[in-house]
Amino acid sequence: MAAMSRIIIAALLLSVTVQAQDARQALTAGDGPDPWFGTFSIIAFDPATNELGVGVQSRAFGAGAAVPYAKPGVGAVATQASANRQYGPKAIALLEQGLSPAEVVKRITDEDPGRDTRQVAVIDAKGRSAVYTGKRVIDRNHDPKDLVHLGGFAGFAAGPNFSAQGNTLASEDVVKAMAAAYQAGKGSMAERLMDALDAGQSEGGDTRGMQSAGILVVKPLPANSDSTVERIVDIRVDDHEEPFKELRRVLNMTLGVPNRLTERSAQLAKEGKFAEAIAEQKKALEINPRNEQAMYALAQRYAQAGDTKQALEQLGHAIRRQPKQWKPQAAADPIFAKLASLPEFKKLVLP
């Protein structure tokens, strides 16, 4: 199985361009006040939906707020390493003027005296991309006194409509795996970006570890639409021991996954498939563990399955969080009819 997976990934990478710098030392702090976002990211354009997106992870605080920039119908930017946060708005403005991503990257880096410590990636709404990695992002010759010694790789892997890039990475395999995962993805852009980040981490990710992550996806408003939402997904995890797991959870909430799981759980229960129904509802609660509606639905599933103890326990969780809502609802709910005579149930639902 492992050998077959490697073959599949290798095949996917045939259309990917890989460029890199590999060294034994990596800068972990930039010059002056610019924060260091030693990180990996992916920028992408989906011609089928006209969505533009950025996904990022870093062993630095708040990468999801600092690295990604995007404007619907124009382009997306990831600015990292010793991040120049002016790159984002400048690059977007230049794309709007008609410059190509390659021209944009050259313009903004030529104007920046600190460019040697920068890494920036730009993609436009035609799917063209360009990446710049400064020569001091990983530098064998810089004064060792100014460096924290880490194994590191800096570079990118680009293909049609996307580019994956990073620095202070475990190896070139990080960006290769991101590229393969994005190309193989079948879900929404946000899900494909998430899959790419997970794939990069599976190959070692940032050599320093994990702390923050984010996903930004934008889309032009349809003509004659009542919608005012151009940011389809705008989520981030600023400081977490498991940022990938937490970002996936938040993404699932954003995409309405818990609601779909609850609907499926209810349908399975109607079909008498109680074990499957309970399993689906547990998934919904894992994604949104503080949601009393999910707790109440799980109590319903247990009641339908005849598990009185678990039904009362989950119902108690929901009622304690929102007694005014769930007490009267549970008292009138036919799903709990068989529990109505129990003292424990009466204690939960009576005023």
Enumerate the language-model features and the residues they cover:
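Canonical positions in the second alpha-helix
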Residues: 283-284, 317-318
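Terminal, low-structured helical/coil segments at or just beyond the last alpha-helical repeat
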Residues: 324-351
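N-terminal nucleophile
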Residues: 22-260, 264
